[in-house]
């Protein structure tokens, strides 16, 4: 009898507790493109999302607000560029023809802008700070018609042995004079204006601040002077030698037309040359850290 009565009470409670839930089923909203300054949480592939060598073009890597270490930072968004041509041929003022992805050229310029304005160099050194990578929308975003490309700055090419995550930001690095160590270019040595990069937080002899293709008629004296000017500005120190502890140097090389081997010095027949602007200790000691933005701080010796 008690069991039957309990069952009736439970059934009546269930019958009278008919709650009505107001609303309609739906799906979570799909976000739009990430804002400038968001961080890259996935490591890019060896071709940095530009599709070279059979790699994915504009992969959907994770981009999110910055917390902790990251692989890169969003420097700009190119709206509607997902379906744009990836191969355009152009000819420069010297008559040289290039074929490449125009989105990559735009991203490279946006990377430079994100780093801050560089000083006008009388020689035109290209600073080795950062690399451009490309990230595209997710599958859901593409289905809904989103066709943007996120331009991302990374410390180096995805295939580089020096490519690593970092903390802090490179936004306006050239303006404020502060740079996360993975973005600097260090090497154990420089041979005929070429070098093999190593992480700057490891012991090294050389920090390379710029590379260039000297114009015909360029002089070594002018090259050396402009290198000093560049390093003085990037180190934020009127005396980049730190009273003689360091030496500012340039290296120039060209390809020998007879042997095809790289040879020190300017080309004598008008062929292209290449140059490197770097700094090294005046003694046999090694560096352990970047000199970028060093200012009045002591040299980071090993």
Locate each region found by the language model:
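Hydrophobic membrane-insertion alpha-helices, especially the h-region
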Residues: 1-14
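Primary mode marks residue(s) on the alpha4-beta5-alpha5 output face of response regulator receiver
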Residues: 15-302
